[in-house]
Amino acid sequence: DVYKRQGQIVLKVVEKENDKLEALILIGGELRDNQGVAFPDSNLSVSAITEKDKEHLKFGSEHDVDFVAVSFVRNASDINLVKEIIPKDVKVIAKIELKTALDNIDEILDVADGVMVARGDLGVQLPLEQVPFVQKQILDAANKRGKISITATEMLQSMKTSYRPTRAEVTDITNAILEGSDAVMLSAETSIGDNPNRVVEVMSIICKETDSRNDTSSLLSKEDSKEDSITTTLARAAVQVANEIDASSIIAFTETGRTPLLISNFRPKAEIITFSTKKKTLNQMNLLWGVDQYPIERKETFSEMLKAANDFLISEKKYNKGDKVVVVAGTPPNIEAATNLIRVHEIGDL
């Protein structure tokens, strides 16, 4: 069978001639330009990265994009091919849409910076009743490795035309967050929907309510991959200390955003405040759960960095003198080195 419009239109191939297929329409419907085609029962030899894709990647690189999301990833080689084209500081998100990608999820996570659970095409490639379990499998794998995770497709589909979501949609978003999604994504609801601002507002309300009720204490005892084992251990320790002393926040100084991602992965009770000298890193941390990020001027010593952050937080009236924070950093500063320092600091105590 051949599926169009994420399974809403179904055709059956009855004859093949050279580069043409003749198909019988089993389930018809309205078809628009540039909509995808799925062949769930076939292994296509076409490359995941076309010549046109390469042109788009070069264009995006010239215009300083922060992320690239790669569709129809099959294995690590597809991700590596993209990484050969784009600058090193652009992060790559693998869209998991194919059965082949599920089989190769570990090797994909070895090289990708994050994954997107693209449920629309997954629901065509797999029986629909398997999609919720596959979603959890992908999110668990990403969280275990400390990679960004995004859940997408039809999260508030009814709100393309409706002012209120269905109860099932609210439950779906809540479950995606409880399962460990760093981000939830809207598609048609905002691109062609009647009231995109309202959709974003509803999504935000659901996310905030879920986060306020989510008990994440068990995450501190979860098993992790051995990747970044030292940084992961320090991130876990920072969250444990912050929880035990009821710290107002965890402050992380970062060059790449890796340490804030690992801290975020443990879902601390305290706010996560990050400082970086790099604009791209600040932009990329927008995808991380619970992270607020701020620019900081380059400093030569950790003490200077801490004083700058301390003064900023007081001036912005985020904290008062005497509030406790846990500080995480790598020393010496200004290099892409592993995090090696944790310190409990009282705001104003300098």
Residue spans for each PLM region:
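Nucleotide-binding motor/catalytic cores of P-loop/tubulin-like NTPases across gene-expression machines
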Residues: 32, 259-261, 267-304
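C-terminal helical cap(s) of enzyme catalytic domains, especially alpha/beta-barrels
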Residues: 83, 190-213, 341-345
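Catalytic P-loop NTP-binding/switch module of NTPases
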Residues: 20-57, 69, 178
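C-terminal binding/interaction regions
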Residues: 321-328, 332, 340-344
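Short, ordered loop/turn segments at secondary-structure junctions
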Residues: 7-8, 16-18, 26-28, 72-75, ...
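Long, charged amphipathic helices and adjacent flexible linkers at domain junctions
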Residues: 45, 93-96, 144, 202-239
